[in-house]
């Protein structure tokens, strides 16, 4: 099929919904989730017993989107016609659950976590733009997503350094 890094470009903002037969999944869940998933991994208040299964699920879903046999099984032993990656809603749900856990345990996030999370999300977008298919994920979609990631990173840093009210 295609590379996992290339398919992450489908998580870019303003990416058009794909309905072709090349099986590119529609993975957009918001640019904020791209930062939150890294903050989830770095957050010390979230136990590894919770992190490992969720991260393994994300990896399994990404591999399922990119592997022909797993995608065939996910689609009920049929090749999809014009609706690829039907299980992408499960991937997005796991991302959102991880994002919610990150926000819920916000006190476990440090300033350097935010910087690393933003840099990691930006790196993933750069790699997906470089290795992705420009016909499926436009260059401007990757650039706009990177701008959103930077804005979210700045806002999160401002939130972290804001004086605490008693």
Each model region followed by its residue ranges:
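Contiguous transmembrane helix-bundle modules in multi-pass membrane proteins
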Residues: 55-65, 69, 78-166
């Amino acid at each position: 099929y295609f590379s996992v890094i290339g398919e992450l470009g489908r998580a870019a903002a303003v990416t058009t919904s794909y309905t072709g037969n090349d099986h590119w999944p529609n993975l957009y869940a918001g640019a904020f989730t791209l930062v939150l998933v890294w903050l989830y991994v770095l957050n010390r208040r979230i136990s590894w017993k919770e992190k490992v299964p969720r991260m393994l699920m994300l990896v399994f879903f990404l591999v399922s989107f990119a592997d022909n046999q797993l995608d065939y099984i996910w689609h009920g032993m049929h090749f999809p016609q014009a609706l690829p990656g039907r299980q992408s809603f499960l991937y997005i749900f796991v991302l959102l659950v991880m994002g919610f856990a990150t926000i819920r345990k916000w006190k476990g996030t440090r300033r350097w976590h935010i910087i690393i999370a933003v840099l990691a999300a930006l790196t993933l977008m750069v790699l997906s733009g470089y290795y992705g298919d420009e016909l499926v994920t436009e260059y401007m979609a990757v650039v706009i997503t990177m701008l959103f990631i930077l804005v979210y990173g700045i806002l999160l840093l401002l939130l972290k350094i804001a004086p605490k009210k008693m």
